[in-house]
């Protein structure tokens, strides 16, 4: 998985 921060985009 990547960063959860990217999901916030």
Swiss-Prot record:
Domain of life: Eukaryota
Annotated tissue distribution: Nacreous layer of shell.
Protein name (record): Uncharacterized protein IMPP5
Native organism: Nautilus macromphalus (Bellybutton nautilus)
